[in-house]
Amino acid sequence: MAKPSQPTRDSHVAVLVFPFGTHAAPLLAVTCRLATAAPSTVFSFFSTARSNSSLLSSDIPTNIRVHNVDDGVPEGFVLTGNPQHAVELFLEAAPEIFRREIKAAETEVGRKFKCILTDAFLWLAAETAAAEMKASWVAYYGGGATSLTAHLYTDAIRENVGVKEVGERMEETIGFISGMEKIRVKDTQEGVVFGNLDSVFSKTLHQMGLALPRATAVFINSFEELDPTFTNDFRSEFKRYLNIGPLALLSSPSQTSTLVHDPHGCLAWIEKRSTASVAYIAFGRVATPPPVELVAIAQGLESSKVPFVWSLQEMKMTHLPEGFLDRTREQGMVVPWAPQVELLNHEAMGVFVSHGGWNSVLESVSAGVPMICRPIFGDHAINARSVEAVWEIGVTISSGVFTKDGFEESLDRVLVQDDGKKMKVNAKKLEELAQEAVSTKGSSFENFGGLLDEVVNFG
């Protein structure tokens, strides 16, 4: 790591969290690592009570002060049930919410904030706070470089594709942007060039792409060698651009418990399976396919005879075919939670079946495991396209939805056929590059030192 200068005694960093989906956990991981490296700096971590309670444990560094903030939902207001409604209410209220809480935290700690570290989605709150406090703004983008490119060049994409003509051009590639030659229009996130471009969320992400070049630094959970074209471009677009991942590999041994939480015995089960034979299926709690597709997954697994571990919420298990669990008891296991990183890194793991969220993709890359992707929303489609067409380490499920036959064919292709073997080779090459990036003198290791300087010593 590039050795940072000695932190000043009055360093105080505000960490503003976007408390939805999987955004909060990586930013907490970065904050913990920064706090460990700079013990004299106070990090005030702002998120909603619900987000904080689901993430935080007693073993976070003592120089992290946790603050619960309002969720932006007016008192007595009844949400529609659409998750995006809660997101939009929070985004609209965020600047005032964080302004109020930041002032209170400064009084409590007795130190002025010198740096505002935020999720990039909170660009407006960040710029507002940074300007008022004359503090630096360091932004964390929670996706990959390809999806960030779509946001950074939204205006160029709209101009070249045409918002009104987009329906006829969905299959065309975005070759007019360097590095996007294999990305199709339909792979971009909703709100870039199709969908409701006037929604609060779409406007927020559009403006985020315009605001990020004004940040003191932008960092992502990735590594330079995965997307070298984008890395070079971002270095000219941003004041400072830092890849500091994969975060799962960057954790030091002292931060990682030797005791793995595995309440359902997944690791003992996988020990008995042959090399590269197991399918791991997991979609998390935010984006699970509909019941009819859960049935198709179950049918495909049972018919294929592929050994499997399926992490599925208990409430979703009621949708599985009658008798499925009994009939496949020797073939696999369905559990409400599984130690994902440890499973992916086991030599018996053959394929990761996921929605293609960035954290899942990077964990699969870090473990050298091919993927079967079923995009659901957000950046899933653009990540899945990168998996299939750019890095060639997996496939996207045919027709975009799970069917019994389609899933069985995908399993066979990845686990048995020759092109699946090539995917495995490509995935292992990326795993090696990821390991090199986080090693001493590796690009991500050095970049974390740069991030530490930006956050603690303000560049």
Swiss-Prot record:
CDD domains: GT1_Gtf-like (cd03784)
Name of the protein this chain belongs to: UDP-glycosyltransferase 78D3
A Pfam family of this chain: UDPGT
Domain of life, per lineage: Eukaryota
EC class name: transferase
Residues where UDP-alpha-D-glucose binds: 338-340, 355-363, 377-380
Protein keywords: Glycosyltransferase, Transferase
Designated gene of the protein: UGT78D3
GO molecular function terms listed in the Swiss-Prot or TrEMBL record: flavonol 3-O-arabinosyltransferase activity; quercetin 3-O-glucosyltransferase activity
EC identifiers of the protein: 2.4.1.-
